[in-house]
Swiss-Prot record:
Expressed by the venom gland. It is found in: Secreted. Residues 1-21 form the signal peptide. The lineage of its organism: Eukaryota, Metazoa, Ecdysozoa, Arthropoda, Chelicerata. This is U10-theraphotoxin-Cg1a 2.
């Protein structure tokens, strides 16, 4: 039982560290990808994406979109 609790705690700690590292990598980008917050003061969307005027995040370009 104690071993199981330790595995859960270490697993959660590892997950937290990995998500933190991924977040640091994302903030180093010069443009936003899918579901990235965009708008005033934020990086522009990468090529192939547009900033949604409604939701203010990067979405895939579509032929019908202005």
């Amino acid at each position: 039982m104690k071993t199981s609790v330790l595995f859960v705690i270490f697993g959660l700690a590892l997950l937290l560290c990995l998500s933190f590292a991924a977040e640091l990598e994302d903030t180093g980008r010069q443009c936003g990808e899918f579901m990235w917050k965009c708008g005033a003061g934020k990086p522009t969307c990468c090529s192939g994406y547009d900033c949604s005027p409604t939701w203010k995040w990067c979405v895939l370009k579509s032929p019908g979109r202005r």
